[in-house]
Regions:
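N-terminal catalytic cores of NTP/NDP-binding nucleotidyl/phosphoryl-transfer enzymes
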Residues: 3-12, 16-79, 196-227
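Core subunits and conserved enzymes of cellular information-processing
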Residues: 230-234, 238-240, 304, 308-311, ...
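Conserved short loop/turn motifs at secondary-structure junctions
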Residues: 28-32, 60-68, 91-100, 123-124, ...
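Secondary-structure transition/capping motifs at alpha-helix termini
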Residues: 16-19, 48-56, 82-89, 217, ...
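Long, charged, mostly alpha-helical binding arms that flank functional sites
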Residues: 250-327, 331
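A glycine-rich helix N-cap at a beta->alpha junction
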Residues: 73-100, 105-106, 113-116
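Active-site cores that bind ATP or allylic diphosphates and position pyrophosphate for catalysis
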Residues: 63-65, 71, 108-270, 328, ...
Length: 552
């Protein structure tokens, strides 16, 4: 690939000026939740740029906060990258592997008078830094401790002599800086929590803004590409690199996050949806998580196509989720084999067809010419069939072209039938629709040349496979969930029809052996995949068509 954008322009300039000889990127998620479609953008940018320049791409699990991280998330992140095909050719690393180095560099800054141990509480530190609008900053009473005193206190912090919040190590930078991140930021805090890899070895942990540039430098990262909210953190990133390593690289650059309509990307909100039982786990097919999209039937190709079409820029924008749907729809239209499924069945009886007869019609697996698939399959035809209830009307509305009393339709791939009568249940519902078939039309048009306008799909009642079908839709009714009124509850915007469950569906016999991961077009209905958790359940990936036209 040869995508060009403002990030590649920066890299091209660095290469042309001889500042670097190869490109090394990384994706550094915190393992405290599951990756989502927004994460796919960061993965795509770092992985594709490394590939584009013949460089290396690392996965680094940024596990510097022991209170929120765990192996469950680590494993899911590794699985998601593998599924996307973005395997890290530079290796898999953990932020916690660098704790010893971070501690060593913190002592270096202390001895050079560039860091000090502070006794201010978190709230006091916020006040002293002038975090409230319009208030000036002022130095902590402990800012001028000697390097020797700071080193002693820092080592005692590590030894566990103080309570959480009692001491903090801060970088000594510039309290007058207009950038709040440069006003003596905290770089180490006390935290008594067992780490998923380090156990109880540490009770002090480096802050992200301190650990991140150190990790990048140790791994040889040349360009640390992250989302736009870290732009104001770049001066601090550079300060750490310059004061510890004395180099220009790694170089941090930022891009706009991917925001999508009718969903939320906040890990806190997503976790709440899971913990409150509003959704069926992190991999619920309505979730924007990669595992949720995978379970719903989205593919790595469709995800990366969507990210690429959304573009790489420094301006925040809101991408219509229908653009993602258009990507998977275009892919599956070419790759998904066609199958017949009746989601709201009503029985149709062909009275003039022998009750003990079964014949098989050859039906195309994918009639799309661009698919270049000439294969067919055998579909059983018997006297009793299932059709969609909406394909029959006793009192048809205007322009109704499907089955009516006295009217004819083509049974897709089989005979033309004419409705002769309707059999009712005691409650007035339809028990069966009785038809006669023109048995000379199995392989073509009627001999008398009459035209039949409607074609409907069907499944043999004797050969049908019972299934549950779940019709998924957008999770939230509000398009821009980032713009809901302040103070409102995001859960008030949940779509009550985000999933409609159809039980008692009738599927053609060939689907009895379908496996999770396979994709099918249910003719006239949509694209579906077997659910990975529940046998006999099919998830709708996306509808068959939509009026949305993706931007060129």
């Amino acid at each position: 690939m040869a995508d060009k954008n403002f990030l590649t322009e920066i890299i091209d300039a660095d290469l042309a000026e001889g500042k670097i000889s190869e490109i090394h990127t990384r994706f550094p998620p915190e393992p405290n939740g599951y990756l989502h479609i927004g994460s796919a953008k960061a993965i795509y940018i770092n992985w594709s740029i490394a590939n584009q320049y013949g460089g290396k791409f690392n996965l680094r699990l940024d596990d510097t906060n022991p209170a929120r991280e765990g192996e469950e998330y680590v494993n899911s992140i590794i699985e998601d990258l593998h599924w996307l095909g973005a395997d890290p050719n530079g290796g898999i690393f953990y932020g916690s592997d660098y704790f010893d180095k971070c501690y060593e560099y913190a002592e270096k800054l202390i001895l050079e008078g560039k860091a000090y141990v502070d006794d201010l509480t978190r709230d006091e530190m916020r006040e002293y830094r002038g975090a409230d609008a319009g208030k000036p900053s002022r130095p902590s009473p402990w800012r001028d401790r000697t390097p020797e005193e700071n080193l002693d206190l820092f080592r005692r912090m590590r030894a566990g002599e103080f309570q959480e919040g009692e001491k903090t190590l801060r970088a000594k930078i510039d309290l007058a800086s207009p950038n709040m991140n440069m006003r003596d930021p905290a770089i180490y805090r006390i935290k008594y929590a067992e780490h998923h890899r380090q156990g109880n070895k540490w009770c002090i942990y480096p802050m992200y803004d301190f650990a991140h540039p150190i990790q990048d430098a140790i791994e040889g990262i040349t360009h640390s590409m992250c989302s736009l909210e870290f732009e104001n953190h770049r001066p601090l990133y550079n300060w750490v690199i310059e004061n510890i390593f004395g180099t220009e690289f790694p170089k941090q650059r930022e891009f706009a996050r991917l925001n999508m309509t009718n969903t939320v990307m906040s890990k806190r909100y997503l976790r709440e949806l899971v913990e409150m039982g509003i959704v069926d786990g992190w991999d619920d097919p309505r979730m924007p998580t990669l595992c949720g999209l995978r379970r719903r039937g989205y593919t790595p190709t469709s995800n990366f196509t969507f990210v690429r079409e959304a573009g790489i820029s420094k301006s925040d924008n809101l991408i219509d989720m229908r653009q993602l749907e258009a990507c998977i729809r275009s892919e599956l239209d070419l790759t998904a084999q066609r199958r017949i499924a009746v989601l709201d069945p009503v029985k149709l009886v062909v009275d003039n067809y022998p009750a003990d007869k079964t014949e098989f019609f050859d039906v195309a697996n994918n009639p799309n010419r661009e698919a270049n698939d000439a294969s067919t399959r055998k579909v059983a035809f018997t006297r009793e069939l299932w059709i969609e209830s909406e394909d029959f009307a006793e009192v048809p509305p205007p322009k109704f072209k499907r089955l009516t009393i006295g009217g004819e339709v083509r049974l897709m791939g089989a005979y033309i039938v004419k409705c002769e009568s309707v059999e009712k249940n005691p409650d007035g519902s339809i028990a069966a629709i009785h038809c006669s078939a023109d048995l000379e039309t199995g392989n073509g048009n009627p001999a008398d040349g009459r035209k039949v306008k409607g074609t409907i799909h069907w499944v043999s009642a004797d050969h049908a496979v019972d299934a549950e079908v779940r019709l998924y839709d957008k999770l939230f009714t509000e398009a821009n969930m980032n713009a809901i009124p302040e103070g409102s509850d995001y859960k008030d915007y949940l779509n009550p029809e985000s999933v409609v469950v159809r039980k008692g569906c009738k599927l053609e016999e060939s689907l009895k052996d379908a496996k999770p991961g396979e994709k099918f077009q249910f003719v006239r209905t949509g694209f579906f995949t077997p659910d990975s958790k529940n046998p006999g359940v099919y998830n709708r990936v996306v509808t068959l068509r939509d009026s949305f036209k993706p931007a060129k």
